[in-house]
Regions:
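Helical "lid/coupling" subdomains associated with nucleotide-phosphate turnover
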Residues: 1-48, 63-172
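A generic, well-ordered mixed alpha/beta core segment in the N-terminal half of proteins
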Residues: 48-58, 62
């Protein structure tokens, strides 16, 4: 969110002044590459995988293939942005949910169009895996396990099926 904020540079300077710590705001590509390195250092990923990092201001999709540099797509589809732009009621109305679905689908279709020419063969459900990282995904894993307190040992390498995600969505 900081990299897109109108007052982002001002905010960074204020934090640097108060803490004495230098801050570098990462580009979406840098964030994706670092997420990929972190995930692949801690997860036994197959030769080909897609890593997703749903942040507040953006979502990074990282296509990773053994021995090739990752292909990073940074999309302005963050959880905070989407909620602020589209949701007005709690729980969200069916119309709001539909609008969010449509917005996400359109953005993903646009972002993924160039991937067809990348050195990544078409996905194969039998061999490919989607790996989630960061807050939104770890929150889903915590909810699925009914954790009262975040425990990385319970979250890392946790397998969350599409059915379980759908079940969580219905509960929320």
């Amino acid at each position: 969110v900081v990299r897109e904020a109108v007052n982002g540079p001002e905010f960074v300077r204020a934090v640097e002044r108060r803490t004495g710590i230098g801050i570098k705001v990462l580009s979406g590509d840098e964030e994706g590459r670092l997420s990929c390195a972190g995930v692949l250092s801690s997860v036994a990923a197959p030769d080909r995988s897609c890593i997703v990092d749903i942040g507040g201001g953006s979502t990074e999709l990282i296509l990773s293939r053994h021995r090739l540099p990752p292909l990073v797509l940074s999309i302005r589809l963050g959880a905070v942005h989407l909620c602020e732009e589209l949701l007005r009621s709690d729980p969200p109305s069916l119309q709001e949910q539909g609008d969010m679905h449509d917005r996400i689908k359109k953005a993903l279709d646009t972002a993924l169009a160039p991937v067809a020419s990348a050195p990544f063969p078409a996905p194969s459900p039998a061999s490919d895996v989607l790996i989630g990282t960061a807050g939104t995904i770890t929150t889903l894993a915590s909810i699925d396990q009914a954790l009262n307190q975040y425990d990385p040992r319970s979250i890392n390498n946790y397998v969350l099926s599409r059915d379980r995600i759908s079940s969580i969505r219905c509960r929320l």
